[in-house]
Regions:
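Conserved catalytic or regulatory cores that recognize and/or transform ribose-phosphate-containing ligands
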Residues: 1-96
């Protein structure tokens, strides 16, 4: 069983793209994986971007796999997460 971090675009999207994050988390959990979903890490949305990135990166470090949502390349945060995952030897999975 893998511990999977979900990465993808949020900023500027309707509902911060939470529906896509939740759908991916549901699918991955149904397959038996432990999932870290950044959309579930905080109940607030009033902090600066850097606050949420720090929170997400801390949670990501406990994972061994990153699951990249569609259009992840358009997200500054997801690009940072992808590069970190690559450098730490994570298994990388792209949403299809």
């Amino acid at each position: 069983m893998k511990r999977i971090y979900i990465a993808g675009p949020m900023t500027g999207l309707p509902e911060l793209n939470f529906p896509a994050f939740h759908a991916a988390a549901q699918m991955l959990r149904a397959d038996g994986h432990t999932v870290v979903n950044p959309a579930e890490l905080s109940n607030s949305t009033d902090q600066p971007w850097e606050y949420y990135m720090r929170l997400s990166l801390k949670a990501m470090l406990d994972c061994d796999t990153i699951y990249l949502l569609e259009n992840w390349q358009a997200s500054k945060g997801a690009f940072i997460e992808f590069n970190l995952a690559q450098n730490l030897g994570f298994h990388i999975v792209f949403a299809s």
